[in-house]
Design a protein with these regions (language model features):
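Post-transcriptional modification and biogenesis factors for structured RNAs
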Residues: 1-142
């Protein structure tokens, strides 16, 4: 994620839904950062996080730890979010792409599932922090 405001919003959303940990990858800035703090409102202190040089390295570690990797992207093999069935005995790691390119194809290829938010307008694009809020709410609700 490139926008520092979006990163801060991700921390706030993660705090709201008691997300276990955020994995920041690649060019994504990390706390402490004044611009991140503007939207995080202290959530960088309440949510655990770790930075990885690459998303693929992160995915490999999460898979070794037993996580099901779910990329959130509009892709050929995606399942609509409203049709996605949460299995209570599984641990899920959600992968969100950056604001310009979304989730990289090689990351999608390594994912166990691809989930898409149904959209009806002409843009077929949501801000990444909005996407994270929608997906987290839907999965918690289920």
């Amino acid at each position: 994620i490139r926008s520092l405001n979006n990163i801060g919003s991700v921390f706030r959303t993660a705090d709201a839904f008691l997300i276990e940990k955020i994995y920041l990858c690649g060019i994504t800035a990390i706390p402490p950062n004044k611009e991140i703090n503007k939207t995080a409102l202290g959530a960088t202190e309440t949510v655990n996080w770790k930075h990885y040089k690459t998303t693929l390295e992160c995915i490999d570690d999460l898979k070794r730890s037993g996580y099901t990797i779910c990329s959130i992207e509009q892709a050929e093999r995606s399942t609509m979010l409203n049709d996605f069935a949460v299995e209570k005995d599984k641990k899920y790691a959600l992968v969100f792409g950056n604001e310009v390119y979304g989730v990289e194809q090689e990351v999608i290829n390594k994912s166990d599932r691809v989930i898409e938010i149904p959209q009806f307008g002409s843009k077929h694009s949501l801000n990444v922090s909005v996407t994270i809020g929608i997906v987290c709410w839907e999965l918690v609700r289920k």
